[in-house]
Amino acid sequence: MTRFGLALLMILVIQGLVTFSEAQLKMGFYDQTCPYAEKIVQDVVNQHINNAPSLAAGLIRMHFHDCFVRGCDGSILINATSSNQQVEKLAPPNLTVRGFDFIDKVKSALESKCPGIVSCADIITLATRDSIVAIGGPTWNVPTGRRDGRISNFAEAMNNIPPPFGNFTTLITLFGNQGLDVKDLVLLSGAHTIGVSHCSSFSNRLFNFTGVGDQDPSLDSEYADNLKSRRCLSIADNTTKVEMDPGSRNTFDLSYYRLVLKRRGLFESDAALTMNPAALAQVKRFAGGSEQEFFAEFSNSMEKMGRIGVKTGSDGEIRRTCAFVN
């Protein structure tokens, strides 16, 4: 290769490295273009969280569901239109997701200060972190620079979001597809320490587990009887809500893992964590461990999840309104 050719190659390599670097997530991505972006998100969260602590559970679920379909690109926020009536938001796993109006409020606050700068995907990620911190949970790094996706697909949501009735094989396959492992599965399931669930997400365990009117033997019988007599009175009940971690639904702590070991997790997916030796070992470790250790490891898994399939650089767009592509 001539000296000129070598020099040209080096220039192209350097340009490529710069482009690659610019296209990555980084801490403080908006420092120059919207210096108060993260403060604005945090302020809106703090203004609402005292009156609505359940917002934290809604946002972390939204973030989880968004990242598992086409990556963390805000596609869960897109409304149906005449040209696309089959969006993620309308898929059964997302019909009970909450927080859409709140994300719109944050977006409006940001647009008033820095129009067209901060992505809806970053808003979900930042607001989730800030809401968990606001209820006393862990914090974690949120590198920013995500861009918003233009595609939202009903079928992809059905195929990729881990279901509450999933067995261990189903769960670890879906997590593995996203680059997550057994430890991430157990840690992220720990978010069930906050929030509520509709009876319809687990009533088959109470009334018709194998199709013959039976009860799931992996669910503590006393707990199941209590649910049937006091909360979910029939398999047709799709409106009643039940705390996933009774008595502390707004407290981010280790009690979820202790409930799982007592066979009192609401979902089949909770019970599934005890069906695999590696997962069970992690559940036992957290159930008997320190909150500080759990918080640190949960934070690592949340940051890892927040990097799934992100769109950066010139990929995607910055939506003007989170519910519609530009």
From Swiss-Prot:
Ca(2+) 2 binds at T193, D245, S248, D253. One of its GO terms (biological process) is hydrogen peroxide catabolic process. Slightly expressed in roots. Disulfide bonds join C34-C114, C67-C72, C120-C322, C199-C232. Substrate binds at P162. Its EC number is 1.11.1.7. The record marks R61 as: Transition state stabilizer. Belongs to the peroxidase family. Classical plant (class III) peroxidase subfamily. PANTHER family: PEROXIDASE 25-RELATED. This is Peroxidase 39. It comes from Arabidopsis thaliana (Mouse-ear cress). The lineage of its organism: Eukaryota, Viridiplantae, Streptophyta, Embryophyta, Tracheophyta.
